Amino acid sequence: MRKLFFLFLLVVTLLPTYAVRSFTLNLTPDGAAQLFAFLPDNPSGRAVVVLPGGGYVWLSMDNEGVDWAPFFNSKGIACFVLKYRMPKGDLNIPVGDAEHAMRMVRDSAQQWRINPYDVGIMGSSAGGHLASTLATHSSFEARPDFQILFYPVISMNERETHRGSVEGFLGTHKSDPEMVKLYSNDQQVRRHLTPPAIILMAHNDPVVPPITNGIAYYSAMQRQGVPCALYVYPSGWHGFGSQPSFTYHNQMISDLSTWLDKLPSHKPEQIRVACIGNSITDGFGIYMPEDNGYPAQLQKMLGEKFYVRNYGVSARTMNWQGRFPYMNEQAWRDALAFRPNIVIVKLGTNDANLVNWTKDHRVIKDQLEHDYQQMIDSLTALPTKPQIYLTFPIKIWNNSFGLNDSLLTTDIIPCIKKIAKKNKLPIIDMYKPFSENTDKSLYLSDGVHPNEKGCRKMAELVYDALKK
């Protein structure tokens, strides 16, 4: 199949541009899973993979699939409609088909004039559940860059969603509370990792209850600080899709079009900056960290030539012996897959928790050095050969959460100095400026986490280091 696909690509590449506007690809040898491609005359680089609904029993290929192609193409967006296979109790079948489609579009970015950093997903009804599953569960390579969800099935709890979709997707696992929770995607939204979304539905949908599905997903996105828009139209029932007969069709098209126009599009040529860290990087305790955390403020300072991503995860340690080691997180795997050009490593605060120093002191220090080196080795092995900056943690003013500032100064900061010297890496000193903030105006009330003003100070320190 792979050989046939690349042969097809060769043929497509050799044909005149005007001759190749739409085509079909088999994702499985028997053609049970197919990808219908519609390429725009004037591509913007953006692409969307469309997943029609049908309760995981059938597919509404026209109204929720190919009929959307003219709209997207008119905006310069490449449209790929997926005919995915029904799960029949094996959820890996449709998930695998959808992930295959996402990877194929990204892998073919050059041939199809697509920006691999701007490939979204759209799903309607059960297709919305499949789309949100990729957005919340898939690895970096198959995860979409944005979501468009029409009246989506989100919950896998039969009492609050479309029962047929639950039966089709989970099969015999529909009564397993762990599986129900795992694939109720409002419970799986991950800050900084789940992509932005727009959700569109009708108030009087009798098939997929809005409150426990689309609105629940919006609420989860808002709680996690992930950008999300919600449109609930007064009427329309379920399945209005692309139909012009939908009373609010023109308004819906305008809403979707405006959202797409305002959605940031990151480019391959941008300098990619990965901010690795704990809750201080994550933006714990501040309102909308996607807008106000230090990585977000750094993005504003650096401008459009840079693409800054926040890979902070609360409570994480550098030390593998800690309770929650950072390198065990999806965020770490994402940071590597991001192929950054610059990496800011701001870990160590949670390593100053006394519970992580219960073993022999020297053993812990040796382990910390080893784990810093492991992270650096993984980053330097990337094909982008990123410039790595190590940072001293900010001062801990209060022993909140069991943290101890003296461990920072006597053990962790000296360890960072040693590792930086060994690897000839620059250091960004965040400890000294924050230790001089005696009125704690840069901190939240816990004396550990920076407020918005403190996040701006952190961003300024990083910005100054990058501009040297």
Positions of predicted regions on the chain:
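C-terminal catalytic histidine-bearing segment of alpha/beta-hydrolase fold enzymes
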Residues: 36, 215-267, 446-448, 452
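Short beta-strand element of the alpha/beta-hydrolase
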Residues: 45-53
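Catalytic nucleophile-loop/oxyanion-hole region of alpha/beta-hydrolase
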Residues: 60-62, 67, 80-116, 244-251
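Serine-esterase "nucleophile elbow" of acetyl-processing enzymes
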Residues: 68, 266-312, 331-339
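Primarily recognizes the serine-hydrolase "nucleophile elbow" in alpha/beta-hydrolase
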Residues: 100-165, 180, 185
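Alpha-helical cap/lid subdomain in secreted, periplasmic
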Residues: 180-181, 300, 304, 326-468
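Short beta-strand/loop motif that positions the catalytic acidic residue
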Residues: 198-205
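Conserved alpha/beta-hydrolase "acid-adjacent" motif
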Residues: 206-213
